[in-house]
């Protein structure tokens, strides 16, 4: 499993678009946690919002749900907000059962990454940088 920041043609100050590169299970969740925290530490200006691109996640087990939930809560405690995009229905159901959906908020799940970015812009969470306007 690989994870990383998803290259995007548009950039938004304070936003990290994080792409999960595979299934999440007991043996891979540490890579997710460590990679996400490293990407947040390297992101400048400092990201306060994380949009997780979960298109490559076909499976998540209960141990991964528990570990991801703990990581999300820890980072939320540091003022970081989360949303998810491109989550498959069965993975979303496991996330709901595992408590991730309740902590992130059911309205913070989007069909596409661009839907999440637009929603956060409309709610005033993200600003469109001047170079990306018009």
Language model regions located:
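Structured cytosolic domains appended to multi-pass membrane proteins
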Residues: 2-134
């Amino acid at each position: 499993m690989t994870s990383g920041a998803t290259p995007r043609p548009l950039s938004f100050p304070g936003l990290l678009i994080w792409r999960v590169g595979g299934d999440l299970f007991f043996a891979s969740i540490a890579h997710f946690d460590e990679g996400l925290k490293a990407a947040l530490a390297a992101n400048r200006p400092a990201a306060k919002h994380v949009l997780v691109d979960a298109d490559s996640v076909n499976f998540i087990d209960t141990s991964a749900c528990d570990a991801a939930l703990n990581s999300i809560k820890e980072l939320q405690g540091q003022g970081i907000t989360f949303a998810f995009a491109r989550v498959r229905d069965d993975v979303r159901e496991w996330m709901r059962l595992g408590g991730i959906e309740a902590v992130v908020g059911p309205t913070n799940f989007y069909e596409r990454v661009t839907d999440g970015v637009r929603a956060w812009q409309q709610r005033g969470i993200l600003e469109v940088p001047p170079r990306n306007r018009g």
